[in-house]
Every structure is written in C-alpha cells, then in structure tokens.
A protein has these predicted regions:
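Conserved polymerase palm-domain catalytic core
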Residues: 79-101, 105, 137-149, 153-301
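A conserved non-catalytic segment of reverse transcriptases
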Residues: 208, 279-353
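Short, solvent-exposed helix-loop connector elements
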Residues: 219-224, 313-314, 330-344, 354-367, ...
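A glycine-rich phosphate-binding loop feature that marks nucleotide/adenosyl-phosphate handling sites
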Residues: 292-300, 347-351, 368-376, 391-400
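Extended C-terminal regions of large enzymes
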Residues: 387-452
C-alpha cells in the first residue's frame, strides 16, 4: 500500500485525522508529474501548456482516482470547448467552493474548501506543471506533498538526527497557517516563476473564490482553502523561504506542511533558536504558541510517531495516535447492539489495515499486542451485550464449550459487560482463533509482515 493510501485510511485514528489531509482530497494534492513519473520541467508554465492533452489526461486520471466524480467525463465532452476557450482568453471564473468543517482531535474545527470537480481538474493540471518546475529547488528537509516524498521519510530522518546526538527538538507549528496566508505575498512568490499573467490571475481567483455553506456565500481576502490540489504545493512555495533560512543557519530539521521540527544538541541552543526563528517567522506568519515547544523528542510527537529515550532511539507510535484509534474502535463497537460481530469486524478491517500500514515503522511492538487484546475484548463485550438475558448467555456459553454449571454461574453474575468481556469464561468461550475465523486482523502480525 502506498503512503498516501495508508494515510488516507489511517486519518480517522492516527492523529492526523483532523481534516488537514482528508481521504479523497489531500491525495489529489500529491502531485503526479507525468506519465512515467516526470514532466519536462523546461516547458514554461503557460496556459496553453497547462491545458494540453497530456497534462489534462494526467490531471483527469488523478481526479478520478481520488473519487472525483462519475459525471465528469460526459460533462467535459459537452462543455470542455467553452471552458478551454475561457482559460485561453484569461477570463475563466472558478465556481464557489463548498465549505466543510472537520473536527480537530484537540478541539476546534479545520475548515476545508472543496472546489467543484471541474476546478479540481484545472487545479491539478496547473499543479502538475508548476510542481515540475519548482520542486527541484525545494529543501531536502521538506517532505509534505512532494513527488517521491512522504511522512515515513520525514519520521526516519528525524530519528537519524536524534540518534546522531541532537536530543532536543524545537517543535514548531504555524498557527492557522492556511487561514492566514497573505495573498499578495504568495502571488509575489509565484510571479518569480510564472510569467503568464493568465495563470497568475487564475490562481488568484482560486485563492479568492467564495466559500458556500448552507446557501450562504463568504468572501475571502486572505487564507488558502484546503481541499484543492493546488493548496499543498502553494503552501510549500510559501514556506520554502523558512526552509532556506533554516538551511542557511545550518539547522537539522524536518518540515511536513506547517509542522516543522528542528533538532539541536542542547537546551541552550534550542532556547536561542526558538527565540530567533520566532522573530523570523512572525514577520510574515504566526507561531502557534500552544502547540510549539522546546522539549525532548520522546516528549513530543511528529506525524503521529514518537521515539524512545534510548541513545539509539526507536520509533514508536505516539500515545495520542493510539488513543485516537481506540476512539474509532469504540465508535464502531458501541451503540448498535443489532449489528453482528462479523459486520462489526468488516467495518473495523479497513480502519485497522490503514492504521497499521501507516504505523508500520514502529519498533516498539508491545502496544500492538495490547491493542490486539483490547480490540478482542471490545468485541467480546459487544457479544455479551447482544446476548442480553442470563438464559441466552448460558446457552451461548454452553455452545462455546463451557460446562452447564460454569455457564450458569458466569451468566448470572452481577458484573457488567466490560468486566465479563475480560473474564476467563468469555476468553475460554470466545477464543482468539474464533476472531481470526471471523476475519479480524492482528495489528502485531500485520506489522511483522510489513517488516519482512
């Protein structure tokens, strides 16, 4: 499974599931640069180049892959000629974008702006060619939404810095970065690369496109809507200056969109860096003081992972990521007693597969064994609730192999479902092998397979 697929499936439970990279939307922002993986970067970014058949076919494939819209193809056959002419003439007007508020794991909401499928197609075509031109100039320490780069690489590089003796981290997150993007500053940066005024005007129109929610339209003078294929690339262009400044100062860092971890050798160096870099950043952006800190790496998380305190630090799954998986499992195993365990396992399977696929890098496996046991206990608890009456429980325990006396004693105890789900009688009656036959996967075994 590719990293973008794993992240999309894991968002609900991994700690990145706050809407920043929603399934079917953030994948569209990962730039596919051409057939075979490369685009001719020497082609200037003009409107005519953007709407060539080659680029449009690549963009179309990407949009459809990411759950674009089944009706796109017939619509294009009927209307593309007029849209194409409007693009060439420089007077194409993007449609309003749909607002979607996604709850953040730590409270509040993240606002997405979802363009129409046609505008996603056009944005993707622009992003493909623009990426081919600018990506080669980006920092090697920038990992978010770039061809051939992913979160796994960022986490592994962070681990190498820590093992190399940089055992303090300046964990810096920009506050409401996407909501506060200065349009003038971004367009100035883009004008250094894009000389075709039609393309620049179109990007500005996308930045200023109205947001619609509940039939109400909202105009915007700042910010960059998350949810379209252009947004991640534009964020990298805007934050490239920060990367270059950190490189100029000789710092070891990993940045993934607006999350930036800078690794230093001492608290003193970290205090000095935090003060100076905050002054640099806040000339144009704002540091999120609540989420930014100088700390030991094992006290923080980065892209859902953390590390152990050992000299040869090991990657582990951050506690918040574990807790969010548990929240997702709880939501699927409680509240609907009529749903069979088999159906519940079927609903759990894609969540568990996506989660462990993303967290395959963990070197601390004890938590996976604990989670496997906890998930089975949740399912035993579901069974106990579904059996409801002591008589039904007695019959089912007997059918599972318990003696009549033991089944009756167990069924008529005064303890609640959770206590019973962890008791010896339920563990003996509903063995681990039974869950395997129902299709439940083991996180521990899945992770071991990834390591083979």
């Amino acid at each position: 499974m590719m990293i973008n697929e794993a992240q999309a499936q894991a968002t609900a439970a991994s700690g990145r599931g706050d809407g920043r990279y929603p399934s079917g939307l953030h994948d569209g922002a990962e730039i596919s640069t051409a057939a075979g993986g490369q685009t001719k970067a020497e082609v200037p970014l003009t409107m005519e180049a953007v709407i060539t058949r080659e680029y449009l076919m690549l963009a179309y494939q990407r949009v459809v892959e990411n759950k674009g819209a089944a009706e796109l193809k017939p619509w294009l056959k009927k209307n593309w000629r007029s849209v194409r002419q409007a693009l060439i003439d420089g007077n194409y007007q993007p449609r309003a974008i749909r607002r979607m508020d996604i709850p953040k794991p730590d409270g509040g909401v993240r606002t997405l702006g979802i363009p129409t499928v046609v505008d996603r197609l056009i944005q993707q075509a622009i992003a493909q060619q623009l990426s081919a031109i600018v990506d080669k100039s980006f920092s090697d320490s920038s990992y978010g939404f770039r061809p051939g780069r992913n979160a796994w690489q960022a986490v592994q590089q962070a681990q190498r810095y820590i093992r190399g003796g940089k055992r303090w981290v300046v964990d810096m997150e920009l506050e409401k970065f996407f909501d506060r993007v200065d349009h003038r500053l971004l367009m100035t940066r883009l004008a250094r690369t894009i000389k075709d005024r039609r393309v620049l005007r179109l990007i500005r129109r996308y930045l200023k496109a109205e947001i619609v929610r509940d039939g109400q339209r909202e105009k915007r003078q700042e910010g960059m809507p998350q949810g379209g294929p252009l947004s991640p690339l534009l964020s990298n262009i805007l934050l490239d200056e920060l990367d270059k400044e950190l490189e100029r100062r000789g710092h070891s860092f990993c940045r993934y969109t607006d999350d930036c971890n800078i690794y230093v050798s001492s608290r003193k160096a970290g205090d000095h860096l935090l003060k100076n870099i905050r002054a640099f950043v806040e000339n144009k952006l704002k540091v999120n003081e609540k989420k930014s800190a100088l700390a030991r790496p094992w006290e923080r998380k980065f892209l859902g992972y953390s590390v152990t305190w050992h000299k040869q630090a090991k990657l582990k799954i951050a506690l918040t990521s574990v807790n969010r998986l548990k929240e997702k499992v709880r939501s699927l195993t409680t509240g609907n007693r009529s749903k069979s365990v088999k159906a519940t396992i079927n609903a759990l399977t894609p969540v568990l597969r996506g989660w462990i696929s993303y967290f395959r890098l963990t070197e601390v496996r004890g938590v996976l064994e604990e989670l496997d046991g906890w998930i089975k206990r949740k399912l035993r608890c579901l069974l106990w609730r579904q059996w409801k009456r002591p008589g039904t429980r007695t019959k089912n325990l007997q059918r599972a192999g318990l003696s009549k006396d033991r089944a009756m004693i167990s069924a008529y105890n005064n303890h609640g479902p959770w206590w019973n789900s962890g008791s010896s009688h339920m563990n003996q009656a509903i063995k681990n092998a039974w869950f395997s036959r129902q299709g439940l996967i083991s996180l521990l075994e899945q992770q071991r397979q990834f390591q083979c």
